[in-house]
Curated annotation (Swiss-Prot):
Function text: Component of the proteasome core, a large protease complex with broad specificity involved in protein degradation.
One GO cellular component term noted in the UniProt record for this chain: cytoplasm
Gene3D superfamilies named in the record: Glutamine Phosphoribosylpyrophosphate, subunit 1, domain 1
Activity regulation description: The formation of the proteasomal ATPase PAN-20S proteasome complex, via the docking of the C-termini of PAN into the intersubunit pockets in the alpha-rings, triggers opening of the gate for substrate entry. Interconversion between the open-gate and close-gate conformations leads to a dynamic regulation of the 20S proteasome proteolysis activity.
Protein name: Proteasome subunit beta 1
Subunit-level organization: The 20S proteasome core is composed of 14 alpha and 14 beta subunits that assemble into four stacked heptameric rings, resulting in a barrel-shaped structure. The two inner rings, each composed of seven catalytic beta subunits, are sandwiched by two outer rings, each composed of seven alpha subunits. The catalytic chamber with the active sites is on the inside of the barrel. Has a gated structure, the ends of the cylinder being occluded by the N-termini of the alpha-subunits. Is capped at one or both ends by the proteasome regulatory ATPase, PAN.
Prodomain positions: 1-48
First-listed, main subcellular location of the protein, grouped into a coarse class: cytoplasm
GO terms (BP aspect): proteasomal protein catabolic process
InterPro entries for the chain: Ntn_hydrolases_N (IPR029055), Pept_T1A_Psome_bsu_arc (IPR019983), Pept_T1A_subB (IPR000243), Proteasome_sua/b (IPR001353), Proteasome_suB-type (IPR023333)
Stored Pfam families: Proteasome
Biased composition (Polar residues): 1-14
Residue segments, region Disordered: 1-34
Length: 243
C-alpha cells in the first residue's frame, strides 16, 4: 500500500487527526494516566466484590460487600466502602482494581460538578451513564465493572458499565466475582415496584449469599439508598443488623 505523499491534502488531514484530542477526554484537563501492564494487575489491590443495584418505586438501592484482596490470595482490607456518591442523587460502585475505580469515581464526580456549575442544573442520570461509558472505553481505568444508580426527573435508573464502555440499564443488576450467587437470589426475590425498604432486604440477602461462597466477597455489607432527596450510605459488619 502506497504511503500518502508528503504535504498532500491527505497527509495533512492525517497529521491533523493525529493531533486532535481524544473524544472521550473530560472538558477540562486530561484523562488520568498510568503505565500499568496487564501483568501488574495481578499484584494490585482489587475489590473482588459483589455489588447489586435495584430500581424501586422510591428510588434506587445499591448494596456491596466490604472486602478488598491483594492478588486474589490475601484479604488486604475488611472495611472498604465500595459505593460512593458522585451526583446529588446518584452513586457508583467500586468493582475491579481499587486504584482504577477510585480514579474513575474522582473523574466522574469532577465532571458532574463542572456540568452543574456551568449550566446551573444537574446532569441527568442517563447523561451521566453515557459519560461513564465513554470514560471506561477511552480511559486508563483497567478492570472496572461498576454499577451506576440514580434518580432524576425521568425516574429511577440502574446501569451496569462494562470495562469496554458498554452501558446497559435494567430493573436490577449485579457485578463482581460473586454475581452468579447473588443473581440466584435476586431472580427469586425481586418484584416490580418494591419500596426502598423492601429492596434493602433483598439486596442484603443477595450480598450475604455471595459472601457465603465467593472468596473475593466478605466482611459485611454497605447499603446505599437513593431518592430524589439525596443519597444515604451506611455500612454493617453484621448482616443481622439489616435482615
Amino acid at each position: 500500500m502506497r504511503a500518502p505523499q508528503h504535504n498532500s491534502d491527505f497527509s495533512r488531514t492525517v497529521d491533523q487527526l493525529a493531533d486532535d484530542p481524544n473524544p472521550y477526554e473530560p472538558e477540562i484537563g486530561s484523562m488520568p494516566q498510568n503505565d500499568l501492564t496487564r501483568a501488574d494487575l495481578d499484584n494490585v489491590n482489587k475489590t473482588g466484590t459483589t455489588t447489586i443495584g435495584i430500581s424501586t418505586a422510591d428510588g434506587v438501592v445499591i448494596a456491596t460487600d466490604m472486602r478488598a484482596s491483594l492478588g486474589g490470595r490475601f484479604v488486604s482490607n475488611k472495611n472498604v466502602q465500595k459505593v460512593e456518591q458522585i451526583h446529588p442523587t446518584g452513586a457508583l460502585t467500586l468493582v475491579g482494581s481499587v486504584g482504577g475505580a477510585q480514579s474513575f469515581i474522582s473523574s466522574l464526580r469532577a465532571e458532574v460538578n463542572l456540568y452543574e456549575s456551568r449550566r446551573g442544573e444537574q446532569m441527568s442520570i442517563d447523561a451521566l451513564a453515557t459519560l461513564a461509558g465513554n470514560f471506561a472505553r477511552g480511559g486508563p481505568f483497567f478492570a472496572i465493572h461498576p454499577i451506576l444508580g440514580g434518580v432524576d426527573e425521568e425516574g429511577s435508573h440502574v446501569y451496569s458499565i462494562d470495562p469496554a464502555g458498554g452501558v446497559m440499564e435494567d430493573d436490577y443488576t449485579v457485578t463482581g466475582s460473586g454475581m452468579q450467587l447473588a443473581y440466584g437470589h435476586l431472580e427469586q426475590a425481586y418484584e416490580e415496584d418494591m419500596s426502598n425498604e423492601e429492596a434493602v432486604s433483598v439486596a442484603a440477602h443477595g450480598i450475604k449469599s455471595a459472601v457465603e461462597r465467593d472468596t473475593g466477597s466478605g466482611n459485611g455489607v454497605f447499603l446505599c439508598e437513593i431518592t430524589d432527596e439525596g443519597v444515604d450510605i451506611h455500612g454493617h459488619h453484621d448482616f443481622d443488623e439489616v435482615l
